[in-house]
C-alpha cells in the first residue's frame, strides 16, 4: 500500500520523464537526426584542468585537443556544470604520500583499491586551474572533488566510497535535470565514474566520445566502456548534437 501518495507521484513522474528522455535519444539515433539539447539537459564538463593537459603533472594524451570541441558543444547547451579535481597537499591518492610506492601502483584502502597518482591538481596551484582556453561563461556550477585528504574522488556525484556525496545529485534533482551529457578527462576514470553515478541517481547519461580522452592504463579504457555500456550509458559523438 502506498502511504506517501505525493512522494509516489513525484517518483513516478520523474521516472516517466527520464524514460521519455532516453526514448528521445534512441529515436534520434534511429532516424539519423541530431539531438537538440533542451531545458532538462545538462552538459557536464569533467576536469579540463592544466595538470591533465600535455605538460601537466598527470597529462592525458591529446587532452588539450578536446578544448575547442568542448567550447563548441557548451555553446549549444543552456545548462553547463564543470568539475575540478581539488586535492590537498599529501593527498592519500598521491604516490608521494606512501613511502616506497610509485605512481600507478595500487594499494588497498578502506573504500577499496586505490591507484596511486603523481601529485596533481593541488589546491591553489596552477595545475589545478581550468584550462585557459576553456570558454564557458554561462557555466552554472563548479563541483570541486577530491578535497577530502583521506579519500579520493573520481565521480562528480560521489566520493570513491560510493556513498559520500559531492552535492551534485541533489543539485540536478532540485533543478529538474533529466539527462546529462559528459565530456572531459579522463574517459576511463572521472568521466566513466561520473557517467555510472549519473545512472545510479536516475539520470539518462550520454558520453560524447570525441570530446573526451582516456589514460588507458592496463586496458582501463576498454573496461570503462564495457562498464558504461552495461549500465546503460549512451556512447555518442559530437556530430550527433545539434549545436
Where are these regions (language model features)?
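N-terminal secretory signal peptides and thylakoid transit peptides that target proteins
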Residues: 1-16
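C-terminal segment of classical bacterial N-terminal signal peptides
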Residues: 22-26
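Active-site acidic carboxylates
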Residues: 31-147, 174, 178, 200-207, ...
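Short catalytic/ligand-binding loop motif for oxyanion handling, primarily in non-cytosolic enzymes
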Residues: 88-92, 151-152, 190-191
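Histidine/lysine/aspartate-rich catalytic loop segments that bind and position anionic ligands
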Residues: 137-166, 170-171
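Glycine-rich anion-binding loop/nest that anchors nucleotide
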Residues: 177-193, 207-213
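Histidine-anchored nucleotide/phosphate-binding helix
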Residues: 192-200
Amino acid at each position: 500500500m502506498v502511504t506517501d501518495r505525493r512522494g509516489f507521484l513525484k517518483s513516478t513522474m520523474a521516472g516517466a520523464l527520464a524514460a521519455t528522455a532516453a526514448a528521445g535519444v534512441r529515436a534520434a539515433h534511429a532516424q539519423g537526426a541530431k539531438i537538440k539539447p533542451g531545458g532538462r539537459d545538462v552538459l557536464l564538463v569533467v576536469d579540463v584542468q592544466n595538470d591533465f593537459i600535455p605538460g601537466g603533472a598527470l597529462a592525458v594524451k591529446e587532452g588539450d585537443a578536446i578544448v575547442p570541441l568542448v567550447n563548441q558543444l557548451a555553446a549549444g547547451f543552456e545548462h553547463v556544470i564543470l568539475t575540478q579535481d581539488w586535492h590537498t597537499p599529501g593527498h592519500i591518492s598521491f604516490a608521494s604520500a606512501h613511502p616506497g610506492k610509485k605512481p600507478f601502483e595500487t594499494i588497498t584502502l578502506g573504500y577499496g583499491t586505490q591507484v596511486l597518482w603523481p601529485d596533481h591538481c593541488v589546491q591553489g596551484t596552477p595545475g589545478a586551474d581550468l584550462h585557459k582556453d576553456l570558454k564557458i561563461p554561462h557555466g552554472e556550477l563548479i563541483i570541486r572533488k577530491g578535497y577530502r585528504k583521506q579519500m579520493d574522488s573520481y565521480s562528480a556525484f560521489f566520493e570513491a566510497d560510493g556513498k559520500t556525496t559531492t552535492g551534485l545529485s541533489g543539485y540536478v534533482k532540485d533543478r529538474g535535470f533529466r539527462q546529462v551529457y559528459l565530456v572531459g578527462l579522463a574517459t576511463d576514470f572521472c568521466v566513466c565514474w561520473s557517467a555510472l553515478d549519473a545512472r545510479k541517481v536516475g539520470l539518462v547519461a550520454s558520453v560524447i566520445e570525441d570530446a573526451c580522452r582516456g589514460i588507458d592504463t592496463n586496458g582501463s579504457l576498454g573496461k570503462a566502456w564495457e562498464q558504461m555500456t552495461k549500465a546503460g550509458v549512451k556512447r555518442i559523438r559530437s556530430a550527433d548534437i545539434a549545436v
